[in-house]
Amino acid sequence: MDDISGRQTLPRINRLLEHVGNPQDSLSILHIAGTNGKETVSKFLTSILQHPGQQRQRVLIGRYTTSSLLNAKEEDISINNEAISLIEYSRIEKELIEADSSLKLQCNNLELLTSVALVYFAKKNCQWCIIETGLAGKQDPGSIIAGQSRVCCAITNVGISDEAFLCKFLSQITESSTNKAIFLLDGSNDEFVRNTITKRCHDVGCPLEITDPSLRDYNVHTDTWGTLEVRLPYSEEEYQIFNLRVAIAVLDFLSKEKKVCISKDQLSQGLISVDWPRSLHRLDYCYESTSGKKIALLLDNANNAKAARNLACHLRTTYGDTPLTFVIAITTGKKVSPLLDPLIRPQDYVIVTRFGSVVGMPWIQSLEPVNLLAFIKNRYTRNVNMQPDLQSVWTFLETSGLKTIVPVIVCGSLYICKELLRLHNCHLPV
Protein backbone atom coordinates (compact mmCIF):
# COMPACT_ATOMS: atom_id res chain seq x y z
CA MET A 1 0.00 0.00 0.00
CA ASP A 2 1.29 3.48 -0.81
CA ASP A 3 2.26 4.80 2.62
CA ILE A 4 1.48 8.47 2.76
CA SER A 5 -0.08 8.63 6.19
CA GLY A 6 3.17 8.36 8.12
CA ARG A 7 5.07 10.92 6.11
CA GLN A 8 2.64 13.75 5.55
CA THR A 9 1.96 15.87 8.63
CA LEU A 10 -1.21 17.88 8.36
CA PRO A 11 -0.33 20.31 11.19
CA ARG A 12 2.22 21.87 8.83
CA ILE A 13 -0.41 22.96 6.34
CA ASN A 14 -2.70 24.02 9.20
CA ARG A 15 -0.03 26.35 10.52
CA LEU A 16 0.83 27.68 7.07
CA LEU A 17 -2.80 28.52 6.26
CA GLU A 18 -3.33 30.03 9.70
CA HIS A 19 -0.38 32.32 9.00
CA VAL A 20 -2.08 33.64 5.84
CA GLY A 21 -5.51 34.10 7.44
CA ASN A 22 -7.14 30.65 7.08
CA PRO A 23 -8.54 31.26 3.57
CA GLN A 24 -10.38 27.92 3.64
CA ASP A 25 -12.74 29.21 6.34
CA SER A 26 -14.37 31.65 3.89
CA LEU A 27 -15.08 28.99 1.26
CA SER A 28 -18.01 26.64 0.61
CA ILE A 29 -16.40 23.30 -0.15
CA LEU A 30 -17.67 20.29 -2.06
CA HIS A 31 -15.27 17.43 -1.37
CA ILE A 32 -14.87 14.69 -3.98
CA ALA A 33 -13.09 11.63 -2.59
CA GLY A 34 -12.40 8.15 -3.95
CA THR A 35 -10.15 6.24 -6.32
CA ASN A 36 -11.94 6.42 -9.68
CA GLY A 37 -14.32 8.98 -11.14
CA LYS A 38 -13.39 12.12 -9.21
CA GLU A 39 -12.60 14.06 -12.40
CA THR A 40 -15.96 13.24 -13.99
CA VAL A 41 -17.85 14.31 -10.87
CA SER A 42 -15.92 17.55 -10.39
CA LYS A 43 -16.07 18.54 -14.07
CA PHE A 44 -19.82 18.03 -14.24
CA LEU A 45 -20.41 19.98 -11.02
CA THR A 46 -18.24 22.82 -12.31
CA SER A 47 -20.17 22.91 -15.58
CA ILE A 48 -23.59 23.07 -13.92
CA LEU A 49 -22.84 25.34 -10.96
CA GLN A 50 -21.40 28.09 -13.17
CA HIS A 51 -24.88 29.01 -14.46
CA PRO A 52 -27.47 28.52 -11.69
CA GLY A 53 -31.06 29.57 -12.33
CA GLN A 54 -31.68 32.90 -14.02
CA GLN A 55 -28.64 34.73 -12.66
CA ARG A 56 -27.12 37.06 -15.23
CA GLN A 57 -23.58 36.80 -13.91
CA ARG A 58 -21.69 33.55 -13.80
CA VAL A 59 -20.96 32.10 -10.40
CA LEU A 60 -17.25 31.51 -9.73
CA ILE A 61 -16.49 27.82 -9.21
CA GLY A 62 -13.01 26.91 -8.01
CA ARG A 63 -11.70 23.43 -8.79
CA TYR A 64 -8.62 21.74 -7.39
CA THR A 65 -7.27 18.38 -8.45
CA THR A 66 -3.91 16.63 -8.22
CA SER A 67 -4.82 13.45 -10.10
CA SER A 68 -4.89 14.59 -13.73
CA LEU A 69 -2.53 12.72 -16.01
CA LEU A 70 -1.83 15.56 -18.42
CA ASN A 71 -1.79 18.67 -16.23
CA ALA A 72 1.08 20.84 -15.12
CA LYS A 73 0.71 21.72 -11.45
CA GLU A 74 -0.73 25.20 -12.09
CA GLU A 75 -3.40 23.59 -14.29
CA ASP A 76 -4.62 21.65 -11.25
CA ILE A 77 -6.10 24.93 -9.97
CA SER A 78 -8.86 26.57 -11.99
CA ILE A 79 -11.90 28.82 -11.75
CA ASN A 80 -14.74 28.06 -14.16
CA ASN A 81 -12.37 25.73 -16.04
CA GLU A 82 -9.81 28.50 -16.61
CA ALA A 83 -6.47 27.58 -15.06
CA ILE A 84 -4.70 29.98 -12.74
CA SER A 85 -2.12 32.01 -14.66
CA LEU A 86 1.49 31.02 -14.19
CA ILE A 87 2.24 34.57 -12.98
CA GLU A 88 -0.51 34.41 -10.33
CA TYR A 89 0.47 30.90 -9.30
CA SER A 90 4.13 31.84 -8.93
CA ARG A 91 3.29 34.94 -6.89
CA ILE A 92 1.11 33.06 -4.38
CA GLU A 93 3.55 30.16 -4.23
CA LYS A 94 6.45 32.55 -3.52
CA GLU A 95 4.55 34.14 -0.62
CA LEU A 96 3.73 30.73 0.84
CA ILE A 97 7.29 29.45 0.46
CA GLU A 98 8.57 32.53 2.29
CA ALA A 99 6.01 31.96 5.07
CA ASP A 100 6.92 28.27 5.21
CA SER A 101 10.59 29.17 5.54
CA SER A 102 10.03 31.76 8.27
CA LEU A 103 7.91 29.28 10.26
CA LYS A 104 10.38 26.44 9.61
CA LEU A 105 7.53 24.11 8.59
CA GLN A 106 9.15 22.35 5.61
CA CYS A 107 5.83 21.79 3.82
CA ASN A 108 6.07 19.42 0.87
CA ASN A 109 5.01 20.23 -2.70
CA LEU A 110 1.51 18.79 -2.31
CA GLU A 111 0.85 20.83 0.82
CA LEU A 112 2.09 23.98 -0.93
CA LEU A 113 -0.04 23.24 -4.00
CA THR A 114 -3.13 22.77 -1.83
CA SER A 115 -2.39 26.01 0.00
CA VAL A 116 -1.98 27.92 -3.28
CA ALA A 117 -5.40 26.68 -4.40
CA LEU A 118 -7.17 27.75 -1.20
CA VAL A 119 -5.51 31.18 -1.13
CA TYR A 120 -6.39 31.74 -4.80
CA PHE A 121 -10.03 30.69 -4.42
CA ALA A 122 -10.49 32.92 -1.37
CA LYS A 123 -8.86 35.87 -3.12
CA LYS A 124 -11.21 35.51 -6.10
CA ASN A 125 -14.28 35.11 -3.83
CA CYS A 126 -15.37 31.79 -5.32
CA GLN A 127 -18.95 30.91 -4.40
CA TRP A 128 -18.22 27.17 -4.56
CA CYS A 129 -14.97 25.23 -4.42
CA ILE A 130 -14.70 21.65 -5.61
CA ILE A 131 -11.78 19.94 -3.94
CA GLU A 132 -10.71 16.50 -5.09
CA THR A 133 -9.17 14.69 -2.16
CA GLY A 134 -7.42 11.39 -1.64
CA LEU A 135 -8.32 8.63 0.78
CA ALA A 136 -5.75 9.35 3.46
CA GLY A 137 -8.25 10.97 5.82
CA LYS A 138 -6.78 13.62 8.09
CA GLN A 139 -3.35 13.12 6.51
CA ASP A 140 -4.47 14.25 3.05
CA PRO A 141 -3.77 17.98 2.52
CA GLY A 142 -7.01 18.25 0.56
CA SER A 143 -8.88 17.23 3.71
CA ILE A 144 -7.89 20.25 5.78
CA ILE A 145 -11.35 21.76 5.29
CA ALA A 146 -13.58 21.04 8.26
CA GLY A 147 -16.58 22.44 10.08
CA GLN A 148 -19.07 24.57 8.20
CA SER A 149 -16.77 25.06 5.18
CA ARG A 150 -17.49 21.55 3.92
CA VAL A 151 -21.05 21.32 2.65
CA CYS A 152 -20.90 17.72 1.47
CA CYS A 153 -18.50 14.95 0.54
CA ALA A 154 -19.08 12.74 -2.48
CA ILE A 155 -17.32 9.37 -2.47
CA THR A 156 -16.76 7.81 -5.88
CA ASN A 157 -15.58 4.25 -6.47
CA VAL A 158 -12.93 3.03 -4.04
CA GLY A 159 -10.56 0.54 -5.68
CA ILE A 160 -9.95 -2.72 -3.85
CA SER A 161 -6.25 -1.92 -3.48
CA ASP A 162 -7.17 1.32 -1.68
CA GLU A 163 -9.59 -0.14 0.86
CA ALA A 164 -6.97 0.02 3.61
CA PHE A 165 -7.15 3.80 3.34
CA LEU A 166 -10.74 3.71 4.59
CA CYS A 167 -9.73 3.51 8.24
CA LYS A 168 -7.99 6.89 7.82
CA PHE A 169 -10.61 8.41 5.55
CA LEU A 170 -13.42 7.56 7.98
CA SER A 171 -12.02 10.11 10.42
CA GLN A 172 -13.55 12.76 8.15
CA ILE A 173 -17.00 11.28 8.72
CA THR A 174 -16.60 11.59 12.48
CA GLU A 175 -15.67 15.26 12.15
CA SER A 176 -18.53 15.93 9.72
CA SER A 177 -21.12 14.61 12.16
CA THR A 178 -20.93 17.92 14.03
CA ASN A 179 -22.45 19.92 11.16
CA LYS A 180 -24.95 19.42 8.36
CA ALA A 181 -22.46 17.96 5.89
CA ILE A 182 -23.77 14.89 4.09
CA PHE A 183 -21.88 11.99 2.54
CA LEU A 184 -22.97 10.74 -0.88
CA LEU A 185 -21.61 7.31 -1.78
CA ASP A 186 -21.35 5.65 -5.19
CA GLY A 187 -23.57 2.59 -4.89
CA SER A 188 -21.40 0.58 -7.31
CA ASN A 189 -18.72 0.26 -4.60
CA ASP A 190 -17.88 -3.19 -3.31
CA GLU A 191 -20.00 -4.45 -0.42
CA PHE A 192 -17.11 -4.07 2.02
CA VAL A 193 -16.76 -0.36 1.20
CA ARG A 194 -20.52 0.28 1.38
CA ASN A 195 -20.89 -1.54 4.68
CA THR A 196 -17.86 0.13 6.26
CA ILE A 197 -18.94 3.66 5.37
CA THR A 198 -22.59 2.98 6.22
CA LYS A 199 -21.65 1.68 9.68
CA ARG A 200 -19.43 4.65 10.47
CA CYS A 201 -22.06 7.17 9.36
CA HIS A 202 -24.67 5.38 11.47
CA ASP A 203 -22.39 5.26 14.52
CA VAL A 204 -21.69 9.01 14.48
CA GLY A 205 -25.08 10.17 13.20
CA CYS A 206 -23.78 11.51 9.90
CA PRO A 207 -26.31 11.54 7.02
CA LEU A 208 -25.46 9.23 4.12
CA GLU A 209 -27.08 8.64 0.74
CA ILE A 210 -26.08 5.79 -1.59
CA THR A 211 -26.66 6.10 -5.33
CA ASP A 212 -28.27 3.54 -7.64
CA PRO A 213 -25.72 0.78 -8.47
CA SER A 214 -27.59 -0.72 -11.43
CA LEU A 215 -26.69 -0.74 -15.12
CA ARG A 216 -30.14 -1.78 -16.31
CA ASP A 217 -30.60 1.72 -17.71
CA TYR A 218 -28.81 5.05 -17.83
CA ASN A 219 -31.40 6.94 -15.80
CA VAL A 220 -30.73 9.08 -12.76
CA HIS A 221 -33.51 9.40 -10.17
CA THR A 222 -33.73 12.62 -8.15
CA ASP A 223 -36.08 14.23 -5.64
CA THR A 224 -35.81 17.66 -7.27
CA TRP A 225 -36.10 16.90 -11.00
CA GLY A 226 -37.63 13.44 -11.13
CA THR A 227 -36.00 10.96 -13.52
CA LEU A 228 -33.27 12.17 -15.87
CA GLU A 229 -32.31 10.24 -19.00
CA VAL A 230 -28.59 10.18 -19.76
CA ARG A 231 -26.73 9.52 -23.01
CA LEU A 232 -23.15 8.49 -22.38
CA PRO A 233 -20.57 9.74 -24.91
CA TYR A 234 -18.36 6.62 -24.90
CA SER A 235 -19.99 3.20 -24.98
CA GLU A 236 -16.84 1.51 -23.64
CA GLU A 237 -16.99 3.69 -20.52
CA GLU A 238 -20.51 2.84 -19.35
CA TYR A 239 -19.28 3.02 -15.74
CA GLN A 240 -19.45 6.82 -16.12
CA ILE A 241 -23.14 6.55 -15.25
CA PHE A 242 -22.10 5.75 -11.67
CA ASN A 243 -19.98 8.91 -11.49
CA LEU A 244 -22.78 10.96 -13.00
CA ARG A 245 -25.28 9.68 -10.43
CA VAL A 246 -22.93 10.83 -7.68
CA ALA A 247 -22.56 14.29 -9.22
CA ILE A 248 -26.31 14.73 -9.66
CA ALA A 249 -26.87 13.49 -6.09
CA VAL A 250 -24.68 16.39 -4.94
CA LEU A 251 -26.75 18.87 -6.96
CA ASP A 252 -29.98 17.29 -5.71
CA PHE A 253 -28.81 17.76 -2.11
CA LEU A 254 -27.79 21.39 -2.73
CA SER A 255 -31.15 22.09 -4.35
CA LYS A 256 -33.13 20.56 -1.48
CA GLU A 257 -31.07 22.63 0.97
CA LYS A 258 -31.96 25.79 -1.02
CA LYS A 259 -28.27 26.44 -1.70
CA VAL A 260 -28.68 26.46 -5.50
CA CYS A 261 -31.51 27.01 -7.96
CA ILE A 262 -31.11 24.76 -11.00
CA SER A 263 -33.83 23.92 -13.50
CA LYS A 264 -34.32 20.51 -15.08
CA ASP A 265 -33.67 22.04 -18.52
CA GLN A 266 -30.39 23.49 -17.30
CA LEU A 267 -29.37 20.14 -15.85
CA SER A 268 -30.30 18.33 -19.06
CA GLN A 269 -28.31 20.84 -21.10
CA GLY A 270 -25.35 20.28 -18.82
CA LEU A 271 -25.49 16.57 -19.54
CA ILE A 272 -25.06 17.37 -23.22
CA SER A 273 -22.39 20.06 -22.97
CA VAL A 274 -20.11 18.73 -20.22
CA ASP A 275 -16.49 18.09 -21.23
CA TRP A 276 -16.31 14.40 -20.36
CA PRO A 277 -12.90 13.16 -19.22
CA ARG A 278 -11.48 9.94 -20.61
CA SER A 279 -9.22 7.55 -18.79
CA LEU A 280 -7.39 6.43 -21.94
CA HIS A 281 -4.80 8.69 -23.57
CA ARG A 282 -3.34 7.94 -27.00
CA LEU A 283 0.07 9.41 -27.68
CA ASP A 284 2.65 9.31 -30.46
CA TYR A 285 5.50 9.31 -28.00
CA CYS A 286 8.70 11.05 -29.08
CA TYR A 287 11.45 9.03 -27.43
CA GLU A 288 14.49 10.52 -29.18
CA SER A 289 15.01 14.27 -29.52
CA THR A 290 17.64 14.24 -32.27
CA SER A 291 15.82 11.98 -34.75
CA GLY A 292 12.26 12.67 -33.59
CA LYS A 293 11.52 8.92 -33.50
CA LYS A 294 8.05 8.10 -32.23
CA ILE A 295 6.05 5.11 -31.06
CA ALA A 296 2.27 4.77 -30.66
CA LEU A 297 1.26 4.39 -27.01
CA LEU A 298 -1.92 3.95 -25.04
CA LEU A 299 -1.62 5.44 -21.54
CA ASP A 300 -3.86 4.50 -18.64
CA ASN A 301 -2.97 4.72 -14.96
CA ALA A 302 -4.87 1.48 -14.20
CA ASN A 303 -3.47 1.81 -10.68
CA ASN A 304 -6.35 0.08 -8.89
CA ALA A 305 -8.47 -2.99 -9.49
CA LYS A 306 -11.53 -1.22 -10.90
CA ALA A 307 -9.45 0.86 -13.32
CA ALA A 308 -7.56 -2.25 -14.42
CA ARG A 309 -10.83 -4.06 -15.17
CA ASN A 310 -12.07 -1.07 -17.17
CA LEU A 311 -8.86 -0.99 -19.20
CA ALA A 312 -9.04 -4.75 -19.80
CA CYS A 313 -12.63 -4.41 -21.02
CA HIS A 314 -11.55 -1.77 -23.54
CA LEU A 315 -8.59 -3.86 -24.74
CA ARG A 316 -10.67 -7.02 -25.23
CA THR A 317 -13.39 -5.10 -27.05
CA THR A 318 -10.92 -3.31 -29.31
CA TYR A 319 -8.21 -5.91 -29.93
CA GLY A 320 -9.78 -9.27 -29.07
CA ASP A 321 -7.18 -12.05 -28.78
CA THR A 322 -4.39 -10.06 -30.46
CA PRO A 323 -1.14 -10.29 -28.44
CA LEU A 324 -0.45 -6.99 -26.71
CA THR A 325 2.72 -5.35 -25.44
CA PHE A 326 2.66 -3.75 -21.98
CA VAL A 327 5.11 -1.43 -20.26
CA ILE A 328 4.41 -1.59 -16.54
CA ALA A 329 5.66 0.05 -13.36
CA ILE A 330 3.80 -0.15 -10.04
CA THR A 331 4.04 1.88 -6.86
CA THR A 332 5.60 0.09 -3.89
CA GLY A 333 2.94 -1.14 -1.48
CA LYS A 334 0.24 -1.70 -4.08
CA LYS A 335 -1.32 -5.15 -4.32
CA VAL A 336 -0.08 -6.37 -7.69
CA SER A 337 -2.51 -9.16 -8.55
CA PRO A 338 -5.69 -6.99 -8.65
CA LEU A 339 -3.90 -4.66 -11.08
CA LEU A 340 -2.59 -7.33 -13.46
CA ASP A 341 -5.05 -10.25 -13.23
CA PRO A 342 -7.53 -8.65 -15.67
CA LEU A 343 -4.85 -7.47 -18.10
CA ILE A 344 -2.02 -9.93 -18.75
CA ARG A 345 -2.52 -13.15 -20.77
CA PRO A 346 -0.02 -15.85 -21.85
CA GLN A 347 0.23 -14.42 -25.39
CA ASP A 348 1.08 -10.90 -24.21
CA TYR A 349 4.57 -9.39 -23.90
CA VAL A 350 5.43 -7.40 -20.78
CA ILE A 351 8.32 -5.03 -20.14
CA VAL A 352 8.70 -4.14 -16.48
CA THR A 353 10.52 -0.99 -15.47
CA ARG A 354 10.48 1.71 -12.82
CA PHE A 355 9.59 5.38 -12.59
CA GLY A 356 11.97 7.92 -11.10
CA SER A 357 11.70 9.85 -7.86
CA VAL A 358 8.57 11.97 -7.48
CA VAL A 359 9.45 15.57 -6.66
CA GLY A 360 8.15 16.59 -3.25
CA MET A 361 6.83 13.09 -2.50
CA PRO A 362 9.79 10.99 -1.31
CA TRP A 363 7.42 8.38 0.15
CA ILE A 364 6.33 7.43 -3.38
CA GLN A 365 8.65 4.69 -4.67
CA SER A 366 8.55 2.34 -7.64
CA LEU A 367 8.31 -1.39 -7.00
CA GLU A 368 11.61 -3.11 -7.79
CA PRO A 369 11.39 -4.37 -11.40
CA VAL A 370 13.11 -7.66 -10.53
CA ASN A 371 10.30 -8.50 -8.10
CA LEU A 372 7.65 -7.52 -10.61
CA LEU A 373 9.32 -9.60 -13.32
CA ALA A 374 9.32 -12.72 -11.16
CA PHE A 375 5.66 -12.22 -10.22
CA ILE A 376 4.54 -11.82 -13.84
CA LYS A 377 6.63 -14.73 -15.12
CA ASN A 378 5.26 -17.09 -12.47
CA ARG A 379 1.64 -16.00 -12.79
CA TYR A 380 0.85 -14.75 -16.31
CA THR A 381 3.35 -15.09 -19.16
CA ARG A 382 6.91 -16.17 -19.90
CA ASN A 383 7.17 -13.25 -22.34
CA VAL A 384 8.58 -10.73 -19.91
CA ASN A 385 11.61 -8.45 -19.97
CA MET A 386 13.10 -6.02 -17.45
CA GLN A 387 14.50 -2.55 -18.20
CA PRO A 388 16.05 -0.20 -15.63
CA ASP A 389 14.23 2.95 -16.76
CA LEU A 390 11.78 4.30 -19.32
CA GLN A 391 14.36 5.39 -21.88
CA SER A 392 15.83 1.88 -21.93
CA VAL A 393 12.39 0.48 -22.77
CA TRP A 394 12.25 2.21 -26.15
CA THR A 395 15.84 1.28 -26.99
CA PHE A 396 14.98 -2.34 -26.24
CA LEU A 397 11.85 -2.27 -28.38
CA GLU A 398 13.80 -0.75 -31.27
CA THR A 399 16.70 -3.23 -31.15
CA SER A 400 14.83 -6.39 -30.17
CA GLY A 401 12.80 -6.60 -33.36
CA LEU A 402 9.63 -6.89 -31.30
CA LYS A 403 6.92 -5.39 -33.49
CA THR A 404 3.36 -4.65 -32.50
CA ILE A 405 0.44 -3.77 -34.77
CA VAL A 406 -1.40 -2.02 -31.94
CA PRO A 407 -0.26 0.67 -29.51
CA VAL A 408 2.05 -0.30 -26.67
CA ILE A 409 0.09 -0.04 -23.42
CA VAL A 410 1.74 1.88 -20.57
CA CYS A 411 0.00 1.36 -17.23
CA GLY A 412 0.25 0.43 -13.56
CA SER A 413 0.91 3.82 -11.99
CA LEU A 414 0.06 7.48 -12.43
CA TYR A 415 3.73 8.28 -11.94
CA ILE A 416 5.08 6.28 -14.88
CA CYS A 417 2.53 7.99 -17.12
CA LYS A 418 3.44 11.45 -15.84
CA GLU A 419 7.16 10.76 -16.23
CA LEU A 420 6.60 9.55 -19.77
CA LEU A 421 4.67 12.70 -20.67
CA ARG A 422 7.41 14.85 -19.19
CA LEU A 423 10.05 13.06 -21.27
CA HIS A 424 7.87 13.34 -24.36
CA ASN A 425 7.63 17.11 -23.98
CA CYS A 426 11.40 17.36 -23.44
CA HIS A 427 12.10 15.40 -26.62
CA LEU A 428 9.80 17.43 -28.86
CA PRO A 429 11.58 19.90 -31.17
CA VAL A 430 11.46 23.49 -29.99
UniProtKB/Swiss-Prot annotation:
Q: Cross-referenced PROSITE patterns, in alphabetical order?
A: FOLYLPOLYGLU_SYNT_1, FOLYLPOLYGLU_SYNT_2
Matching entries from SUPFAM superfamilies are given as: MurD-like peptide ligases, catalytic domain, MurD-like peptide ligases, peptide-binding domain
Q: Name one GO cellular component term.
A: cytosol
- Tell me the residue numbers annotated for binding ATP: 37-40, 300
Q: Which UniProt keywords apply?
A: ATP-binding, Ligase, Magnesium, Metal-binding, Mitochondrion, Nucleotide-binding, One-carbon metabolism
- UniProt record similarity statement: Belongs to the folylpolyglutamate synthase family.
Q: Name one GO molecular function term.
A: ATP binding
- As recorded in UniProt, its EC number(s) are 6.3.2.17
Catalysed reaction per UniProt?
(6S)-5,6,7,8-tetrahydrofolyl-(gamma-L-Glu)(n) + L-glutamate + ATP = (6S)-5,6,7,8-tetrahydrofolyl-(gamma-L-Glu)(n+1) + ADP + phosphate + H(+)
* Pathway info: Cofactor biosynthesis; tetrahydrofolylpolyglutamate biosynthesis
Principal localization reads mitochondrion
Q: Enumerate the InterPro entries for this protein.
A: Folylpolyglutamate_synth (IPR001645), Folylpolyglutamate_synth_CS (IPR018109), Mur-like_cat_sf (IPR036565), Mur_ligase_C_dom_sf (IPR036615)
PANTHER family tied to this protein: DIHYDROFOLATE SYNTHETASE-RELATED, FOLYLPOLYGLUTAMATE SYNTHASE-RELATED
Residues bound to Mg(2+):
132
**Protein name listed in UniProt:** Probable folylpolyglutamate synthase
- Which EC class heads this enzyme's classification? ligase
The record's subcellular locations are:
Mitochondrion
**Primary role:** Conversion of folates to polyglutamate derivatives.
Gene this protein is translated from: RMA1
Q: Name one GO biological process term.
A: one-carbon metabolic process
